[in-house]
Structure formats: C-alpha cells, structure tokens
C-alpha cells in the first residue's frame, strides 16, 4: 500500500502558468486517482458492488463535467479539491456507504452480483433489489 504515502506528500502546488500546464496537471491527477483505485477497492471492500473499470469511468465523468472550464486558476482549484477528496478516501476518512452513495449509486454503476435473498413478500423483494449493500 504505497499509494497512501505518496498522496500524503502533496502540498499546494504553484498555479499553472497556462492552459497547457493545467491540462497536464489534470492528466496527472487522473493517473494518480486511477492508480489508487485498487487500494480504494481493498480498503472499502467494493469488489461486490462495483468493478475497477466502473470507478475509472466515474472519475473520468467527474473530470468531463468540468471540461468547459478554461481558466487555469479554476482548473488548479478543482484539481486541489479532487486531490483532497482522493486523499480523504485513501486515508479512510470516509465510510463505505459514502463512497458507494457518491461514486457508485450516484453514477448508476451498481452491478448485479448474483442472487441474494429474494424475500418472501413483494415488499422484501423490492427492498432487497433496491438496497445496494
């Protein structure tokens, strides 16, 4: 688990000089986030809920939501917030249901992992199919 130690050393970087440098930092952040996915999957025991590729998709979707921004200072601020969020997740500052609710259910990435207890009544069947734990 070398990823948590690498993320802790990140401080506030200087502002990007131009849009090209800010773009490079976005790609660096995306690589760091993708490299920490196996650690996150292990820490939060997410193997039964989501696949690593689906988490990569959720990260890229968050980045694409801000693709229209062209101000390097705003991009730097968003990267800083993203690194702070990633550090909190890797340092286990969030609980499993926070991760599932924000990045799995919020993105619609819940995968069906097979037959679970189906329940005896319609109410229980609906409850078990809607409950993502």
Curated annotation (Swiss-Prot):
Location(s), subcellular: Mitochondrion inner membrane
Highest taxon in the source lineage: Eukaryota
Keyword Membrane attached: yes
Coiled-coil segments on the chain, per record: none
Keyword annotations from UniProtKB, A to Z: Electron transport, Membrane, Mitochondrion, Mitochondrion inner membrane, Respiratory chain, Transport
Gene Ontology terms: cellular component: cytosol; mitochondrial inner membrane; mitochondrion; respiratory chain complex I
Topology class, membrane: Peripheral membrane protein
Keyword Protein biosynthesis appears in the UniProt entry: no
PANTHER family: NADH DEHYDROGENASE [UBIQUINONE] 1 ALPHA SUBCOMPLEX SUBUNIT 6 (PTHR12964:SF0), NADH-UBIQUINONE OXIDOREDUCTASE B14 SUBUNIT (PTHR12964)
Family membership: Belongs to the complex I LYR family.
Subunit description: Complex I is composed of at least 49 different subunits.
Annotated function: Accessory subunit of the mitochondrial membrane respiratory chain NADH dehydrogenase (Complex I), that is believed to be not involved in catalysis. Complex I functions in the transfer of electrons from NADH to the respiratory chain. The immediate electron acceptor for the enzyme is believed to be ubiquinone.
Protein name: NADH dehydrogenase [ubiquinone] 1 alpha subcomplex subunit 6
Source organism per UniProt: Arabidopsis thaliana
């Amino acid at each position: 688990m070398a990823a948590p130690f690498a993320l802790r050393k990140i401080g506030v970087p200087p502002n990007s000089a131009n849009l090209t440098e800010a773009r490079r930092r976005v790609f660096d952040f995306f690589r760091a986030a993708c490299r920490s996915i196996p650690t996150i999957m292990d820490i939060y025991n997410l193997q039964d809920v989501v696949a690593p590729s689906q988490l990569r998709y959720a990260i890229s979707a968050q980045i694409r939501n801000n693709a229209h921004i062209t101000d390097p200072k705003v991009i730097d601020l968003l990267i800083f917030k993203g690194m702070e969020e990633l550090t909190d997740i890797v340092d286990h500052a969030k609980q499993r249901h926070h991760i599932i609710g924000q990045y799995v259910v919020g993105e619609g990435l819940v995968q069906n992992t097979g037959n679970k207890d189906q329940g005896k009544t319609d109410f229980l069947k609906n409850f078990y199919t809607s409950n993502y734990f």
